[in-house]
Regions:
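Non-transmembrane, amphipathic alpha-helical segments
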Residues: 4-7, 27, 31-35, 81-84, ...
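Charged/polar positions within long, soluble alpha-helices
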Residues: 21-24, 47-52, 97, 101-105, ...
Length: 180
């Protein structure tokens, strides 16, 4: 099991770094979605390794060939549904799952604080669970998430998108501000 735990942690670190590299490369238009995909993957692998370390199975009891979903793993590790880390991960997971690439570019500035919190949480949690200093793999100055432009106002969103999508975006933006 030690070998599986180590492989999960190693892959987790790689996914984490890849997410940061994608996000911080300004020429990539798919960077918000790419970051959310890789950062969630990094968390999933790191938390599964933490479960193994605690002596818990990472497989569904009724399907021993299938590992637990990231949602289940997050709930097992962060049992309090109001934990800031859990809320942060669930919001990024929601973004990853809905994959609204044509919308998220306009909200990059709103996602940046959420993503930055996720990065810092990962740094702290990989240290707590696995005693790993992430700066041994990536320089500390690369742990910063940067956003490059001002968000659209609610008025601009309403002019740019259909009423249904505009209201969804405004609601999503308000939720992000609460979590940041």
């Amino acid at each position: 099991m030690e070998d599986i735990k180590k492989r999960l942690v190693d892959k987790s670190i790689e996914a984490f770094i890849l997410g940061l590299e994608i996000y911080n490369k300004p020429t990539i238009k798919y960077r918000i979605e790419g970051f959310s995909f890789f950062i969630i993957n990094a968390w999933e692998l790191m938390l599964k390794a933490a479960l193994i370390k605690r002596g818990e199975s990472i497989y569904f009891p009724d399907k021993p060939d299938r590992t637990l979903s990231v949602e289940v793993v997050i709930r097992k590790i962060y049992t309090d549904k109001n934990t800031r880390i859990r809320l942060n991960l669930e919001k990024i997971l929601e973004l990853r799952n809905i994959s609204t690439h044509y919308i998220t570019e306009d909200y990059e500035i709103k996602y940046a604080p959420l993503f930055q919190a996720c990065v810092l949480n990962f740094v702290n949690e990989i240290k707590r669970f696995h005693d790993i200093d992430i700066t041994q793999f990536i320089a500390q100055n690369f742990l910063t998430i940067s956003a490059s432009y001002e968000p659209l106002s609610n008025e601009e969103i309403r002019l740019k998108y259909s009423p249904e999508i505009a209201e969804k975006l405004i609601k999503q933006g308000n939720e992000l501000e609460v979590l940041s």
